[in-house]
Swiss-Prot record:
Matches recorded under InterPro entries: Enolpyruvate_Tfrase_dom, Enolpyruvate_Tfrase_sf, EPSP_synthase, EPSP_synthase_CS, RNA3'P_cycl/enolpyr_Trfase_a/b
Positions of 3-phosphoshikimate binding: K20, S21, R25, S166, Q168, D312, K339
Keyword Transferase among UniProt keywords: yes
Gene: aroA
Gene Ontology terms describing biological process: amino acid biosynthetic process; aromatic amino acid family biosynthetic process; chorismate biosynthetic process
Name of the protein: 3-phosphoshikimate 1-carboxyvinyltransferase
Family: Belongs to the EPSP synthase family.
EC number: 2.5.1.19
Pfam families in the cross-refs: EPSP_synthase (PF00275)
Function, in words: Catalyzes the transfer of the enolpyruvyl moiety of phosphoenolpyruvate (PEP) to the 5-hydroxyl of shikimate-3-phosphate (S3P) to produce enolpyruvyl shikimate-3-phosphate and inorganic phosphate.
Main localization (coarse): cytoplasm
A Gene Ontology term for the protein's cellular component: cytoplasm
Active site as annotated: D312
Species, as recorded: Streptococcus pneumoniae (strain ATCC 700669 / Spain 23F-1)
Amino acid sequence: MKLKTNIRHLHGSIRVPGDKSISHRSIIFGSLAEGETKVYDILRGEDVLSTMQVFRDLGVEIEDKDGVITIQGVGMAGLKAPQNALNMGNSGTSIRLISGVLAGADFEVEMFGDDSLSKRPMDRVTLPLKKMGVSISGQTERDLPPLRLKGTKNLRPIHYELPIASAQVKSALMFAALQAKGESVIIEKECTRNHTEDMLKQFGGHLSVDGKKITVQGPQKLTGQKVVVPGDISSAAFWLVAGLIVPNSRLVLQNVGINETRTGIIDVIRAMGGKLEITEIDPVAKSSTLTVESSDLKGTEIGGALIPRLIDELPIIALLATQAQGVTVIKDAEELKVKETDRIQVVADALNSMGADITPTADGMIIKGKSALHGARVNTFGDHRIGMMTAIAALLVADGEVELDRAEAINTSYPSFFDDLESLIHG
């Protein structure tokens, strides 16, 4: 598709879609709880719809009516063997978390996904689950999907140090630990997003968190709840950057989730000199209103414990860095290589084709700014975040056209993205 270019200003206020991580988990917890769960403001992107369909296939009654998702929970042991293989679509979150959920189910399942998911390594989750007594295997030594899994009613607790910082693996092991008899201890390499921990407590579960150490005593029962999903800061990130780099702009983003494990992008914007204001903070929902204005930016260094707090925002942060004076270094982000695409290479290739100066490294990028961007043809390779990054980059292009191939990938997390963009262009 042909993208909008040469935009002189952006103005307006929008409410970004519901948080993808919280939306996935609300369906999982609601299904495993006893009683009814109602979920408000859920993200209806393709990944979350995949999770919803998988639990329907596992025998859970889920109704989507009048904007509210109602889940009739079946309890920790109530899932039923599906008639067919479970389709995870493009969703790494779905296949990894649900592997942990099914660890205690006494039936065999096959889980598969699209071409992109079929290239993503699952050994990070299959190895610890095998230690707990689960029979699980995929293709090649990296256990690529499709996966075959047979759970066990005699799940063993685990003491496991994560070799990588991964909220998905941590969460999969927590779901398994809830079904194992005894104490499981999970030790993170770096602190990652803690939505599973927060929601476990909300649904009446128990755990203790001491720094990077999480202890779960199993088995446990959960009770249905009301969940209100805040806006997704990973989706808001595209507008935060757009408001900072498009001249004469001021954008107001309402109801954005600001869980402290997800706000790395706010730290980076401030380090780069961006004008960003946080107001209307709701400490219970962990949400707020974020306002940004066009800013003169400077390069910075991004690495270490900051990376898990902004891993999904790094593509759009790379674009931000192309518009900052000086050098920005992103390091310790090798995890980007096993996202929907190799995001280190794909981001560098896409933005360099538009005139940026980015050198990919083994664990990140070196970005020299400030760069004037020009027209190009960019392929998302099925990666939603590459698509949205390119659409924001195109706004700065004064010379030539920007063509985006496979733009439909954006529906993974933000089906209304282009509608919201139009409203801000005309705001």
